[in-house]
A protein has these predicted regions:
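Phosphate- and other anionic-substrate recognition elements at nucleic-acid/protein interfaces
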Residues: 1-144
Length: 144
């Protein structure tokens, strides 16, 4: 498994990590995407364990996004998008809304940390980290 070898090399290069927090795989509309994400997460978790990571936590996407201030679009926001872009397919609107929320995450990270992030995956990782630092017990599954 190439992904596992690469991730283990990454962990080993940086001397391992005491803890990692990973985003839950969420099944939305694509079973293939969910399966691919699960495989990648398995490679990450397996490699983390082999490299000595002792604490592995998790968070759902909507949890960290809400905490960051990037809640789901309201009905009014969705209707406004449809009014500005009439006649598009349902998948077009979903894609547009997803991209809008990704842009919001990048802006929020800039506001909170004064860092311009151009890659939405990096911004998501920052958002997960922000939530984790402020909700550590929840992230690792311990209750207060």
């Amino acid at each position: 498994m190439d992904a596992g070898k690469k991730v283990k090399a990454f962990f080993d290069y940086y001397g391992g990590f005491e803890a990692i927090i990973i985003e839950h795989t969420v099944f939305m509309n694509s079973p293939k995407t969910a399966a691919d994400l699960a495989l990648v997460q398995g490679a990450i978790l397996g490699s983390a364990g082999q490299s000595g990571t002792k604490i592995i936590g998790k968070v759902s996407p909507i949890t960290w996004q809400n905490y960051l201030g990037n809640k789901k679009l309201t009905k009014d926001e969705q209707l406004a998008i449809r009014a500005k872009n009439p006649g598009k397919s349902v998948s077009w609107y979903k894609s547009y809304e997803r991209n809008l929320r990704k842009e919001r995450t990048m802006r929020l990270i800039d506001v909170i940390y004064d860092r311009k992030i151009a890659d939405n995956d990096v911004a998501d990782a920052c958002g997960i980290g922000h939530w984790s630092l402020n909700n550590w017990e929840k992230a690792i599954g311990e209750s207060k």
